[in-house]
UniProtKB/Swiss-Prot annotation:
It is an enzyme of class 2 (transferase). Its EC number is 2.7.7.6. Transmembrane segments: none annotated. GO terms for molecular function: DNA binding; DNA-directed RNA polymerase activity; ribonucleoside binding. The keyword Phosphoprotein does not apply. The gene is rpoB. This is DNA-directed RNA polymerase subunit beta. DNA-dependent RNA polymerase catalyzes the transcription of DNA into RNA using the four ribonucleoside triphosphates as substrates. Keywords: DNA-directed RNA polymerase, Nucleotidyltransferase, Transcription, Transferase. Gene3D superfamilies: 2.40.50.100, 2.40.50.150, 3.90.1100.10, DNA-directed RNA polymerase, beta subunit, external 1 domain, DNA-directed RNA polymerase, subunit 2, domain 6, RNA polymerase alpha subunit dimerisation domain, RNA polymerase Rpb2, domain 2. The RNAP catalytic core consists of 2 alpha, 1 beta, 1 beta' and 1 omega subunit. When a sigma factor is associated with the core the holoenzyme is formed, which can initiate transcription. GO terms for biological process: DNA-templated transcription.
Amino acid sequence: MGQLTKKFGKIEVTLPIPHLLNLQVDSYKKFLQEGAAALAPDEGLEGVFRSVFPIEDFNRTASLEYVSYEIGEPKYDQAECISKGLTYEAPIRIKVRLVVYDVDEDSENRTIRDIKEQDIYFGTLPLMTEKGTFIINGTERVIVNQLQRSPGIIFEHDAGKTHSSRKVLYSCRVIPMRGSWLDFDYDHKDILYVRIDRRRKMPATILFKAMGMSRSDILEYFYKKEYYTLEDDGRLMWELDKDLYRKDVAYADVADGEGKVIAKAGKPYTKRSWRLMLEAGIPAVEVAPDYIAGMFLAEDIVDEATGEVLAEAADEITLDLIDRLRECSIKRVPVLHTKGSDTSSSIRDTLLLDKTADQEQARVEIYRRLRPSSPPTPEIASTFFENLFRNPDYYDLSPVGRYKLNQRLGLTTTQERVLTDEDILTAIRVLNHLKDTHGPADDIDHLGNRRVRPVGELVENQYRIGLVRMERAIKERMSLQEVSTLMPHDLINPKPVQAVLKEFFGTSQLSQFMDQTNALSEVTHKRRLSALGPGGLTRERAGFEVRDVHTSHYGRICPIETPEGPNIGLIVSLTTYAKVNDFGFIETPYRVVRDGQVTDEVKYLDASSEHGEVVAQANARLDGDHRFVDEFVTTRVRGDVIMSPREEVTLMDISPSQMVSISAALIPFLEHDDANRALMGSNMQRQAVPLLRSTKPIVGTGMEADVARDSGACIIAEADGVVRYADADRIVVSYEGDLYPRTGGVRSYDLQKYHKSNQSSCFGQKPLVSRGQVIRKGDVLADGPGIEDGELALGKNLVVAFMPWCGYNFEDSILISERCVKEDVFTSVHIEEFEVVARDTKLGPEEITRDIPNVGEDMLRNLDGSGIIRIGANVKPDDILVGKITPKGETQLTPEEKLLRAIFGEKARDVKNTSLKVPPGIEGTVIDVKLFNRRSGEKDERTRNIEDYELARLDQKEKDHIRALTETTREKLAPVVVGKQLAYGLAGQKKGEVIAEAGQTLTAEMLEGLPVKKLSGLFKSKDTNEAVQQALESYDRQIEFINAMYESKREKVTEGDDLPPGVIKMAKVHIAVKRKLNVGDKMAGRHGNKGVVSCILPQEDMPFFADGRPVDIVLNPLGVPSRMNIGQIMETHLGWAAKEMGRKLALMLEHGQDLASVREQVKTVFASDAISSEVDNMDDETFVRSVRRLRDGIVTKTPVFDGATEEQIWSWMEQAGLANDGKTELYDGRTGVRFHNRVTTGVMYILKLHHLVDEKIHARSTGPYSLVTQQPLGGKAQFGGQRLGEMEVWALEAYGAAYLLQEFLTVKSDDVTGRVKMYEKVVKGDNFLEAGLPESFNVLVKELMSLGLDVTLHQEEGKKRTKRAGMTFGDGTSY
């Protein structure tokens, strides 16, 4: 029975939160096409192979074709990979076919001569664990999803910032997934230029001509034509067209056939007069003789008599040209329709700049611009141009690029992944329209223009890069050798692919060491989106806009959770309900609204699809029929928040928490916190260290169970079933249904104990179930670190008082009770791993041994006979963990050694002590030792002991597994055999004992103690015997499989290890360090209220309540108002009310009140129909147990943006008998005197963060020095010193502390001889300081020497102690 929980949420959530790791797991499954019946040819790994193969040689005499691939089973399981430092990967085999052709020299036709098919080992591929991580070289890593600009087309303008005229210049860019970028932009003179791959710009019409268009074609595409007629009487007539209306002034009266004037001279044409003229059948109207002067020709004008071109298309019409056309009897003049239209003459102006005449010249010009160093020929230029945008091998828009291009340009005709002529021309038409109408530019920060590249796609791209490298090598190999004699494996070498994968998983910016501090940090890391990485932004170039919160982020990207440093806004998190669709766009779910009624139909929409929808908020009030109560509803339309009539609403949010990430959704009363503090709160929860005893928060949000369930830290039941065995080491479950058919539905879960996480925190699981318990799918079987009862539990519920206390909580410092140290409230366990390797050196092998020269017995007391520390030993800094000796080179023998050799006649062992010792700052208990030996090497006693222990564990596991299978089989057979007549009698275990006679029926009691094997052929009924036999055959097969499985595990234990070359033996020692709460530790709440422990006060000195109970923690009240995180105060009040109410209910039981009244009180407190029915259905024993669990407080759930109101909190406080202002009288623990003012007190959830003082504190007297400057090194890792910078020097100079300064800058730093003398003087007790020359001065002198300046020290005559630095130049002069 779960704990009774008070839920304050009012909004009914109709959709469960999707699995939090779906993005990672589904993406990699799609890449491998796991579970697919047939492989899709253009997806994942199959698509990569098909895109590179077939590979042909340069002469087309042979072709290497891909057939299929197969992924094998991994050699080691995940636990072995982590323990041995290996990569969790599976082998890949590909089937390829080598086809050799005979080529006819004349016709160039090919005929197949030979086909060879072969299976080839193609290296390995890292596999993803079920937790969404990769194990690379023994460490768990996460591939972070990249957020990058989507392929497609984007229209932009410079907002008038580029040119001094402040003219707005428009541009557009076509971005492919792979290939050349294409940019079109206008300059201030309205000339359209094109850039390919951001090279030198050129007139865009060159590109149009290269596509095969003539001048006339270009003009015809972009402009409409008007026609004018040159009459013999000198008049100029304008031919009417219904599409070419222009508000021009009529030159002469225009009358219809009946003489009625439609348009008067001197008056402008109206749309009505234009329509009447067309209806009257008037073909043309007269215009002024010079009307077309200044317009542009739409076509070439040719004198038909002579064939002479009088004027070319796009030429400007002049009065002289009009006269010439009349002379040549040209009647009809085609003109571009630019006058009075929205279309400018920019394309025509660009054509005039373009000096190329035809397609060939245009292509040569493009080649010359992009390849300036190589001489162009028409053929090369033509091939080059075709490859630029039209060849799928070099250019790929990708399905998403094509989708975005079609969506933006309104195209539906093509699904090609290359760029077509229609795409380019339509893009220019849209760009022209934007420029001519001053339309808005696209928003590049809109999530419709940014897409997620999940892990599957990132790995796919890397695999493709590797295969392309391999393709080059294969082609070269095919051309160098006689292909007909080769087999496919002679051509294929998978090393380039493996190298690319290794580099990506090991060193890529997106492959990160997993943050494993706690369960939340793991999940958050896998849901992170990064705009950095290859192909993304850099933090230096990223501006404010790309980092800022955008309206399209709502429900897709969390506006709160992001780092505080230089990466702010570049690294973000997915929201709780967000999904990524097949195109990589983030989608969020909405409920569909029809005719003002909210339905349960759910629609996932990306940011582009949401455009135009009217979306109501999740907290909009609904009546019983799910209709909006208010006439006007708060909605979002195109990013703006407006009040809309309820009839216009089309969608509604699913839940108030859908706009924030899981970290932010764990902050109760988030709506009352300032965003900056909420950001800190969500980030600091990820740094919380799992404590020795986890406690879930009294005030939660309801998200805790979702995070714990999906984190992978807990063990979750995969189906309904029964627990067969449970202890601290393992849980054995038999599942119903078809799960694990080879083991009869039985699965054994190993619980992890004292396992080291990536951040050295302790990863341990504890069982929640007991033997014989019936479980349901999704039940939590075992809690992980920082989890209690399947809910996230990162901190502790502490009684808090907001008051100053003697300055100890000045500036966010924290005063805490000694009870937290005594009772291990904030104690955590950290595990440190130390490794030692014995190698084969040139001077001989290193040896792990107990026999170490010049080491006393007390240092060896915890080492065993093999020189390795025993498990359970308490160690402190400088203790030996593993004894190791290394051979030394030949040295000069001392007289003593010569004497020894003369006496004993042998060389004394010449070795040095290189043992593994405990480093400074580590004090703890050895909890595990792992030894790794070469397969062929001899095993020492400790290795044999470890192996024996492991084998005994495996034997026990196998017995438990088989026992569970036997019980399951017996239960499955019970309905078949119980009540059936026996054909034979049943003998008992003891001699002469008879359980049942022949002819009796078998009872359930008899079956219980009976070995299942004895049921074979036991019954009179043939059908029963057949059913039993069938079940027993299946049982035997399953036992056989379990035996084989454990046998292979035993072999792995005893077979030895694959060690790197030159390594004889390796040992790893794990030390558990207990870190108690200490002054200097960083602590925080969930609202960004962080601080450092300044004082741990004895319990009796802490402020206390009137009944004598002391508070646990004292915080500064001044930390609240300026930070504006009022959520912490509301949490404090609700926590106090919940704690007191729970205590009150538990006391009612203890004081002997009758259960009926306690039940009624519980129902009143929870005020929930669901809880009331649950309480009514409980038997007395369960009810008493449930109420006793409330002693420490009633667990409450107050979801973000839908939590408890102030009125509800006040009501609860009144019920608990507390003042509704949340204040109480406190007494000083030191004097017993009551404080003057009442103090805000309550219960707050406090976390201990990973910044522990024990790990940061560091001291040094002497240690390593830098080789060049001879100054001490810096940092704890190098055992370095404290840096005294120039500002510190200024401070000492200001105080005139000359001797102190001299000491700091010489003997305590880089005066080599001085510090040796200093040491001698300290030993002798002489306190006189004699400073010498700092080594850094010598470094300066040497640097000056490198500039040709010789610095020497002179002694002046007549002055003994005075020294002066002088400089001697190359010509002998000095000063």
